[in-house]
UniProtKB/Swiss-Prot annotation:
Name under which the protein is recorded: 6-carboxyhexanoate--CoA ligase
Family note: Belongs to the BioW family.
Function: Catalyzes the transformation of pimelate into pimeloyl-CoA with concomitant hydrolysis of ATP to AMP.
Organism: Methanococcus maripaludis (strain C5 / ATCC BAA-1333)
GO molecular function: 6-carboxyhexanoate-CoA ligase activity; ATP binding; magnesium ion binding
Gene coding for it: bioW
Cofactor(s) this protein cannot do without: Mg(2+)
UniProt EC number: 6.2.1.14
Amino acid sequence: MFSLKMRASRNGNHVSGAERLVNEEKIEKISSELIKRAMSHENGVPDFINLKIEKVTEKINKLKHLEIKTVHSTSKENSRNIARNLLKNELEKYYLKNGKDIEKIDELIDFAFKIIDAGNMRGAAILDLDGNRLENILERGIRVKNIDTTEELSEKILKDSSLTERTVDAIAIATKVVNCGVISELCTSDNFSYTTGYVATKDGYFRILNLKDKGQVGGRVFFVENSKIDELYDKLENMPVTVY
């Protein structure tokens, strides 16, 4: 197996990124698809594209995908309240476990929304329960690497007309993240026209319509219990995972 990693930018601003795990005979085909994806991105034609291909020598871990649940909402305000409640329900368990003030959870979630609304990060921000950012490089964040979905799962998802390639990408990331010890994830898309975002916890992948406005940037935040950041980085970046 080979890991393919694509990232594209324009004037130093992140435009697109994608990860795939493929057999040798598919490298050329998938590489072409990733470059085409970067060049046709709605956020603009990039002036820089990096495509990295590496042989994977470690065992591929197979993970069952999180259950996909779609939450319908017609306003950004309502959608964000839904996301907030999903996050609070999960975070509260860890606040109580660690003897922390649950009244501080809203502040943590406010900070997370501020991060994703600022956008222009290639990867995700990581927040501990005290609101500390734990990424090695704040402007870059952490990229979840060495991931893919099986062809069967991809085909199953895309048979649903309400789901897209973005869902396929996101379910791979969310499933790996939750299985690496992240409490929950909050995400909105980089694509200006795509307003659906999600919250992921061990209970599922919750697609929430209208989580941001059209034309708005996107971002990703991981909530973690402890600060074993080196171990988390190693898993998220290096552990090969296929989601089925």
